[in-house]
Every structure is written in structure tokens, then in C-alpha cells.
Amino acid sequence: MASISPYGKRFISYLRREQIRRLLATKYRVDGRGPEQTRNVEINVGVVKTADGSAEVKLGKTHVVAGVKVGLGQPFPDAPDEGVLVVNAEVLPHASPYTEVGPPDEFAIELARVVDRGIRHCGYVDFKKLAVEGGKAYVLWIDLYVINDDGNLIDVANLASVAALKNTQLPVVVKDEAGVVKLDRNNKAPLPVDISKAPIAVSVGKIGNVLFLDPTFEEELSLDGRITFTFSEDKIVAAQKTLGYFTQSEIEAALNLALRGRDRLLEALKSALK
């Protein structure tokens, strides 16, 4: 296991930070993009043959793999007629210069929580269809592995999870001779998802008074603020301010900017899942 050093222990040189800030003030970025431009996105599914569903997403140099494992378990007490979703995230030791060997830290936990919240509240997966007889339910375990962190992990991890769920095959529920409910892993069916409700997370960074999409790792070390919106169709299903502060007008501007970024990511997702 590995964890990421807290923001206070990550650093960027003063000169590099000032270069990033000065360029953004003129609506340019150190990698040549404008504030509204995202890096090239690549989505591949079925990349982990031992998983029930999987996908990898590369956004620029940021690289995340998501694997789905299906099991049987007890539903949550407050949702006895629904399936269960569990999301875990791990940053591999070589993913970043600031990754330390150890248990998942607050960032990895937050990453998993944001992804979980977006999927759980959008209707992409109908969890009521995942309840099975005998008081049991399907359990969908999503394991996220950060292969390389060059910024904007939340957006990339979310996209990888959504694509992996679309790729997931559910083992059929059967009863053995003793009447015990179990999974037949030799007989599977696609996990039903509604692609029109796919949750898309879009993070907006703020440096000075400039808002921009898809921050790189260096830009993240220079941020004054960051807010993430998760959209399903034209609705906001989750919002998370992970750094700094935003005025009301900045939140409105960030929302409009995030909507434009959402359209590009959703188009890439649909193209990859055809």
C-alpha cells in the first residue's frame, strides 16, 4: 500500500510557481493549453482479465486503472433491497515523487469517497436490481489504482470507474444442493447501466482570479482553490470543494466551465464504450 504526502509536505519551487501564476494571469499555461482546455484523454476497457470489469484512463500523463470484483454479501441496513457499492483507492509507490509507503491517507480516502458519491446518487447503476433472494445482495467492489499522478486524479478515477462498471459482467446467482445462494462465475451477464446517466466528475482549479480545467500536478501545487462537480445528465449529483475558497460568482463561473469540460469527457466515454 502507499499514501500521498499531505499538501503541506509537497512543494514546488518559488520560481516555478510564479511562472505558472504569471502565465495563467495572461490565460496561458506552462504546457501550452488555455484555461478551458483539457489534456488528451484515452479510455480502454477490459484491461484486467482477472476482474469482472475493468478500465484504464489516461489524461495526459495521469494514469488510473479501475477493477471491479463482484461478490455476494449483506445489504446495508438502511437499504435492505439494494446492492452494495464499495470503492477503494490506492496510489502506487511509483505514481508520484510524494508517494510514501503506508496505509491509504486522507487523500486516497477522499478520492474513493468522491467517486463513490457520484456513482451512488446518479442512477447510472440501478442498485435495486442488485438485490437477490435470501436477504443477500450483489456487492460491487471498485478498486482504483493510481499508476501515475500528473494531476486531476478525481476526474480520471471517476471516469475509470464508470467505464469499468460498463465493462462488468455479473456472475449469475444460483443455489447449490443445500439451497445456499452463491455465484456461478462460469455464467455471467452484463451489469445493467444507464449510460445516459453516467456520472462525470469535473474539477476546476483557481489560481489568482483565473479558473481553469484539468490542473496538472505542478498546477495543483500552486492552487488557491479547487472545486469538483459531478454531473449526471444536466443535474449536479455531487459537489466537493477540496481546497481554498470561492466567492458566489466564482462558483457560478466554475460551474459553467465544468459543464463545458463535462461534455468533452462524456463524449470520450461514449466513444470508448461503443
UniProtKB/Swiss-Prot annotation:
GO molecular function, one term: mRNA 3'-UTR AU-rich region binding
UniProt keyword ATP-binding present: no
GO biological process terms on file: rRNA catabolic process
Acetylation in keyword set: no
Stored SUPFAM superfamilies: Ribonuclease PH domain 2-like, Ribosomal protein S5 domain 2-like
Record-linked InterPro entries: ExoRNase_PH_dom1 (IPR001247), ExoRNase_PH_dom2 (IPR015847), ExoRNase_PH_dom2_sf (IPR036345), Exosome_comp_Rrp42_subfam (IPR050590), PNPase/RNase_PH_dom_sf (IPR027408), Ribosomal_Su5_D2-typ_SF (IPR020568), Rrp42_archaea (IPR020869)
Keywords assigned: Cytoplasm, Exosome
Family: Belongs to the RNase PH family. Rrp42 subfamily.
Record-given protein name: Exosome complex component Rrp42
